[in-house]
From Swiss-Prot:
Alphabetical keyword list: Isomerase
Protein's organism: Trichormus variabilis (strain ATCC 29413 / PCC 7937) (Anabaena variabilis)
Pfam families, per database record: Rib_5-P_isom_A
Keyword Protease part of the UniProt annotation: no
Binding-site positions, substrate: T33, G34, S35, T36, D90, G91, A92, D93, K103, G104, G105, G106, K130
Gene: rpiA
Catalytic residue list: E112
SUPFAM superfamilies the record matches: D-ribose-5-phosphate isomerase (RpiA), lid domain (SSF75445), NagB/RpiA/CoA transferase-like (SSF100950)
Biological role stated in the UniProt entry: Catalyzes the reversible conversion of ribose-5-phosphate to ribulose 5-phosphate.
Protein name: Ribose-5-phosphate isomerase A
Family annotation (PANTHER family): RIBOSE-5-PHOSPHATE ISOMERASE
EC number: 5.3.1.6
Length: 236
């Protein structure tokens, strides 16, 4: 019996494949985190195995992307060994009309921001449900905090009008721990009118390592959607 994937899964696969097709031989590639980016890593591995793509190296943004890269045969390197990144491919939790993003649903936004901003070209892969008129409409802003500062940072964010909530683990007792060994506060704001300024304000709070607002960095947004039961990919 043949099992057919559901349209949403097929759509994510198509978006991942479209992003992987933009990678050229000889590239240094930033490898993001998330379900759609996982398909990108898989298809990069397929292109390498077929010989269509050669001489690329990836820089993973999380343990997840590192494990997947090894699984699919994508060679890896580190920022210590390169002087640039040609292209980065990553997902997002929200995308506004200016291509500003909220990221960090996987608690990997700190490493993702380092890699994505370094890239000469940053490709975002999302489904149409991630498109919003204004950041913060659906998704909270993740803020990575060193553990000893969680209380003062929480209080400082409340003074800014935010509603912070410590992210708790799933299938694990206690809070989520990032790859850097820190906590994550998910912060809701009534309205994010100026994401550029809010990103700076949050990062200026002592004890905050990084937040999930990404501004002025996305070059191309590949959007997957399902129409009449068929997966489609369009570009913003």
């Amino acid at each position: 019996m043949t099992v057919t994937a559901d349209p949403v899964t097929l759509m994510k696969q198509e978006v991942g494949k479209a992003a992987a097709a933009l990678v050229k031989s000889g590239s240094i590639v930033g490898l993001g985190t998330g379900s759609t980016t996982a398909y990108t890593i898989q298809y990069l591995g397929d292109r390498l195995k077929s010989g269509e793509l050669t001489d690329i190296v990836g820089i993973p943004t999380s343990f997840q992307s590192e494990v997947l890269s090894k699984q699919y045969g994508v060679p890896l390197t580190t920022l210590d060994a390169v002087d640039h990144i040609d292209i980065a491919i990553d997902g997002a939790d929200e995308v506004d009309p200016q291509k500003n993003l909220i990221k960090g649903g996987g608690a990997a936004h700190t490493r993702e921001k380092v890699v994505d901003y370094l890239a000469n070209q940053f490709i975002v892969v999302v489904d149409s449900g991630k498109l919003v008129d204004r950041l913060g409409s659906v998704f909270a802003v993740p803020v990575e905090v060193i553990p000893m500062a969680i209380t003062p940072v929480t209080n400082a964010i409340k003074q800014l009008g935010g509603k912070p909530e410590l992210r708790m683990g799933v299938k694990k007792a206690g809070p989520v721990i990032t790859d850097q060994g820190n906590f994550v506060l998910d912060v809701r704001f009534d309205s994010i009118d100026d994401p550029v300024n809010l990103e700076k304000i949050l990062n200026n709070i002592p004890g905050v390592l990084e937040n999930g607002i990404f501004v002025n960095c996305a070059d191309i947004v590949l959007v997957g959607e399902v129409k009449d039961g068929q997966p489609l990919v369009r570009q913003l």
